C-alpha cells in the first residue's frame, strides 16, 4: 500500500474505525500500552495514533505525542483528548511514519500499534522509530 492509498483508506474508515476495529484490537492495544507504562515520566511517541483509542491508557505522568497520516483520524483523537481531559497528551501531529519530524533520541519509548502492515517501506519506518528513541 502506498502512502496515498493509506491516507484514502483511513479517511474512509475514520467515521467507523472505533466501532469496527476498536474491540478487535483492544486487547493488544492495552497490553502494549501497559508495557510502555513500565517507568514513570516517560516521553512516548505513538506512531499511527489514529482516533486515539490508546491515549486514555497511558500513565498520567508520561508525555505522549501521537502522529498519524490521516487528518480525519487525528481530528477524532483530538476530540477524544479534549473530551476526556487527557493532559498527558503533549501533541497530535499529521506526519508520515517514514519521515518523522523529530530530533534523534526525542523519546524514551515508541509504540506503533498495527502500523507496520500499512507503511510502504517497513524498513524505513523501523529505522525512523530507532532514530527518535
Where are the language model's segments positioned?
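A short SAM/SAH-binding and catalytic strip from SAM-dependent methyltransferases
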Residues: 109-121
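A short glycine-rich, Lys/Arg-flanked "PGG" loop and its adjoining helix->strand segment in the class I
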Residues: 123-133
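Conserved class I S-adenosyl-L-methionine
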Residues: 1-39, 53, 76, 83
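GHKL-family ATP-binding catalytic core of two-component histidine kinases
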Residues: 70, 101-103, 120
Amino acid at each position: 500500500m502506498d502512502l496515498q492509498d493509506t491516507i484514502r483508506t483511513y479517511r474512509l474508515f475514520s467515521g467507523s474505525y472505533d466501532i469496527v476495529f476498536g474491540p478487535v484490537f483492544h486487547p493488544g492495544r492495552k497490553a502494549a500500552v501497559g508495557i510502555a507504562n513500565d517507568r514513570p515520566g516517560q516521553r512516548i511517541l505513538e506512531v499511527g495514533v489514529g482516533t486515539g483509542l490508546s491515549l486514555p491508557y497511558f500513565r498520567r505522568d508520561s508525555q505522549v505525542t501521537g502522529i498519524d497520516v490521516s487528518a480525519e483520524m487525528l481530528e477524532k483523537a483530538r476530540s477524544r483528548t479534549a473530551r476526556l481531559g487527557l493532559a498527558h497528551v503533549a501533541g497530535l501531529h499529521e506526519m508520515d511514519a517514514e519521515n518523522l519530524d523529530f530530533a534523534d533520541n526525542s523519546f524514551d519509548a515508541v509504540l506503533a500499534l498495527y502500523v507496520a502492515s500499512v507503511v510502504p517501506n517497513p524498513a524505513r519506518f523501523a529505522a525512523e522509530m530507532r532514530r527518535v528513541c
